[in-house]
Amino acid sequence: MMGAFYIGCGLSLAAAGLAPNLTTMAVAMFALGMFAAIYHPVGMAMLIEATNARGRSLAFNGVCGNLGVALAAGISAALATWVSWRAAFYVPAVLFVLTGIVYLWVTPYDRHQAKSRVSSPAVPLTPRLAVMLFGLFIVIALSAGLTFNVLTIALPKIVDERLSRDLPLLFVGGIATTVLVCGALAQLSVGRLVEWVPPHVIFAIVTGIGFLGNLWAAYAGGTALLVALAIAVAAIYGQVTVNDMIMARYTADAWRGRVYAVRYFLLFISAGVAIGMISLLHESGGFALVLGVNAVIALLLFITTLALVAMIISVEGRQRKPQPAE
């Protein structure tokens, strides 16, 4: 599947670069989206299964992904400016296909290993608890996705509008990038921390901090706004690693890919909702209203996380309880 991800994305990008009209371009981009969607449910499950240091591995993987998103626009713009817009598709197409060939060459075929994957999680759950846990994860995925996307999408405009309307574009971009770097550093720090502190405890702390950061940002201005945004972004980035860790612990290897597929489907859906939400709320009350509503969503995330933590404490305590001798 990962080979299909690499080579499929490469061929789709090449087709987009060769597209003679908008219809062909749309078909190529649709194919690119289909192949790109393979990564999160398959790649994340493989990473978790293979690593012995889940926290650090997930954090590093997340930072690399965010770095790729941050660099993509600049690299594409440079290629389009200095070469042509088609080069912005051809260059990553070649890199994808070559990476896919190398991946298939150096990675052993593991079909038989896949059939022997464990069908029960590290911590067994009753069917009722499993359904409740999955329901909480759905609410967490939607609320975290909305909070994340509202902040990251609106961040440059928030800085521009709330600080000053006369700031140079380069300065605004620099401030927004600095705030996002705080998120990346938090992600790495949390990845280290979860190897020493129970992930569910960190999850509750991080989401609580995220709520406070969003609430502060809704009322702050000037330097205080930048600090509040940095706290909110750091928290929402940091919770991603802990969320993945908890899902890995309570999901069997054989089902982990499906669970991650549902989670990232909800996250991608929330991205589209966030764009419409920002537009509607900003038109009604500016970014004060946008950040205020985002704080309410962050509060929902925090409350749901507390419910998840309470369930985990109960399950873990029951598992550690010594069984009576027969």
Predicted regions and their residues:
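Extracytoplasmic gate region of multi-pass secondary transporters
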Residues: M132-A184
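A late C-terminal transmembrane helix in Major Facilitator Superfamily
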Residues: Y250, A254-G285
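Interfacial helix-cap and linker-helix signal at transmembrane-aqueous boundaries
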Residues: A78-V83, V159-D160, L193-V194, I278-G285
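Cytoplasmic helix-loop-helix junction between adjacent transmembrane helices
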Residues: A28-G65
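Symmetry-related core transmembrane helices of the 12-TM Major Facilitator Superfamily/SLC fold
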Residues: A87-W105, L291-A307
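Hydrophobic core of transmembrane alpha-helices in multi-pass small-molecule transporters
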Residues: S12, T24-I38, L142, A224-G238
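Helix-breaking motifs and short loop linkers at transmembrane-helix boundaries and internal kinks
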Residues: L18-T23, N52, Y219-G221
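Structural signature of the two symmetry-related core transmembrane helices
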Residues: M1-A14, V201-W216
